[in-house]
Each structure stands twice: as structure tokens, then as C-alpha cells.
Amino acid sequence: DVTSDIFEFNGSEFTYDGNTHSPNITTKNNIKGVGNFTVKYFKEDNLQAEINEPKDVGTYIVKITAVEEGDFYNAYSGYLTNDNWKFAINLTPTITTYKDEYDGNPHPVISIEESTIPPNSIIEYSVDNGQTWYILNSNDNIPTVSTVREAENTKIFIRISNFNSNSNDDTWTSQEYQ
């Protein structure tokens, strides 16, 4: 009989970049004669809704279905899974501090690579150790500095929320940037 024990799962951590990510599922090396099978993905917090392209931040459960008959195994139409068949797509934004020479012109304290943050996220910044947060948008840019002294005295934190379409309470807060 076909069971989850005959399959091997590889790949448990991915970094969000807007692209689809999925682990590798194969039959174990010493297992022969299994027919073709279909891999399905589900968000851990909603096991009813199949995800066609796992690319959003979150934890996913992997299930195998529609195993075709092979030389040594019968067909199987139910779902097969294992407690270890999980993988995560983690939010890991690329945030860099200004590194060029100061020339008296204003330069943003940091830059954020947009492709590393999910669309529709709320991005905020704080320059007072997280006491006050300001939403970052086209009307409110990242604070700028013009001199080395200003740069040394400006500390900024970034907070990203609402990045997971299935949950409104996810929040990621950065380390301090200076």
C-alpha cells in the first residue's frame, strides 16, 4: 500500500521574494514501482483551501494525492501527509544603510528593497526607539541625513505589518539601523 513513509521531503525554509517556492518531494531511493503523484499545498491555518503557488509569507503543509498505479503499488486517491511535511516562507526584508560619502546633500538613512516585502504591506518607521511609528508612503519618506554627525545621531527601526493575506496580526520589526 502507498503510505507517506515511502516519500522523502526536502526543503523547509524559504525567504520571501515574491516568487513561488516549494520543497522537493520524491520517492525514497530504495522504493521502486510507484506511479506518478500530485503534490498539493495548503496554508497551515487553512487546511481546506489549496494553494496553487506557495509564494506568500507563512507556513505551508504539503500533501500528496492522486497516486497512479505503479509496478509495485496500487493507485491511491486520498491525501497522504506527514507531520514533518511543512515548510515556511519567511519575511526577510533587505534593508541597507547609506554607505556612500556625505556631500552635504540629504540621503535616506536606509533603503528598503521593495521586492523583499509583500505587496499591500504596511511599512512604518520610528526614530525614537519605537515610541512613535510613522507610515512610510509617497508623502512621508524615510528620514534623510546630510552629514556624518547627523548619521551617527539618527537611529531608525522599520516595522512591517499586514504582509500575510490570511492574517492581520502579523508584524515584523527590524533591528536598529544607524
Regions inferred by a protein language model and the residue ranges of each:
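Solvent-exposed beta-strand/loop surfaces, strongest in extracytoplasmic domains of secreted
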Residues: D1-Q178
